[in-house]
Design a protein with these regions (language model features):
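Flavin-dependent oxidoreductase catalytic cores
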Residues: 1-153, 157-173, 181
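Short hydrophobic/charged patches on amphipathic alpha-helices used for structural packing
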Residues: 57-58, 206, 224
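Phosphate-coordination loops involved in phosphoryl transfer and adenosine-cofactor binding
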Residues: 146-150, 219, 224
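Short gly/ser/thr-rich secondary-structure transition/capping motifs
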Residues: 132-137, 214-220
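Beta1-alpha1 glycine-rich phosphate/pyrophosphate-binding loop at the start
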Residues: 1, 152-219
Length: 224
C-alpha cells in the first residue's frame, strides 16, 4: 500500500548494525529464518541478505521461501565469483572472510582513522583481500620490463600474495617457508571453529600457488 516494489531484508538496526552485514563470527544464513517469515505477510518480492551461501540461497528461492538473495561483499573480493560458480569452479572463488577491514571504509566515526580522507579512496568501498576493488585503473598487474629471480621469504598470506603478483608480472619466483606448510600465522588465526572462511582463504592461496609458476621451498628457513 505504501508503494514499495521489493523488501531487501535483514535484522540490522542502528543498535545492532552487524546483523545487516554479519561478520565472520556470526553464522552463515543467519537472517534467512526471519526473512522467510516476512514473506508470508507481503505480496511483493522479498530478498534476504547477510552471509548467505549460494547453495542455501538457491534452495530457499526454489522452495519459494524467499524471492531472491542479496550479495555484496563477495563481489568486492572476487568480481568473477558468479561466473566461476556457474562454471563449477567454486574452489577458484577467492572467499570474502567478512573482516570489514576495508569494505567499511565508508563507515566513518569521529576519532577513528579512516582512509576516506584520501582523495583516491573517498566515497569508495574497498576490500582487504583485493586492492584492485574500485581501483582497477590505478592498480594493474603489468608485465615487468626485465624478468628477475625473486626470493620471497615467508609463506603466510602476505608472502603468497607477493609471490603470485611477482609471478604474474613474469618474474621467476621462489617462495621460502621455514615450516612444513604454507599459511603462516594465519593458520593459528583461522583455528576457531567459526573461522571457516579464513581456512578457505588459506586453501585458496595454497591452490593458487600450486597452479602458478612459483617454486615453493618448505622447511627452508632463511637466515642472515
Amino acid at each position: 500500500d505504501a508503494g514499495y516494489d521489493m523488501l531487501n531484508c535483514d535484522n540490522g538496526t542502528y543498535d545492532a548494525w552487524y546483523w545487516a552485514h554479519p561478520p565472520g563470527y556470526m553464522p552463515e544464513n543467519c537472517n534467512l529464518e526471519d526473512v522467510e517469515h516476512i514473506k508470508k505477510f507481503v505480496d511483493i518480492p522479498v530478498v534476504c541478505a547477510g552471509r548467505m551461501t549460494p547453495q542455501e540461497g538457491a534452495s530457499a528461492v526454489k522452495e519459494n521461501k524467499i524471492d531472491a538473495v542479496g550479495f555484496a561483499r563477495q563481489f568486492l573480493t572476487d568480481p568473477a565469483w558468479v561466473t566461476k560458480l556457474m562454471e563449477d569452479r567454486e574452489e577458484d572463488i577467492k572467499p570474502c572472510i567478512c573482516c570489514h577491514n576495508a569494505c567499511f571504509n565508508m563507515a566513518h566515526y569521529e576519532g577513528v582513522p579512516n582512509i576516506q580522507d584520501m582523495d583516491d579512496t573517498s566515497n569508495m568501498s574497498r576490500c582487504a583481500l583485493n586492492p584492485m576493488t574500485m581501483q582497477s585503473k590505478k592498480y594493474k598487474i603489468v608485465p615487468a620490463r626485465v624478468s628477475k629471480s625473486v626470493a620471497v621469504i615467508g609463506g603466510g598470506i602476505g608472502g603468497m600474495e607477493t609471490a603470485l603478483v611477482a609471478a604474474a608480472r613474469g618474474h621467476a619466483v621462489t617462495l621460502y617457508e621455514k615450516t612444513d606448510r604454507l599459511g603462516g600465522i594465519f593458520i593459528e588465526a583461522a583455528a576457531p571453529s567459526f573461522k571457516e572462511k579464513d581456512r578457505n582463504l588459506i586453501e585458496w592461496y595454497r591452490r593458487a600457488i600450486n597452479n602458478s609458476s612459483v617454486t615453493v621451498k618448505l622447511n627452508s628457513e632463511i637466515k642472515r
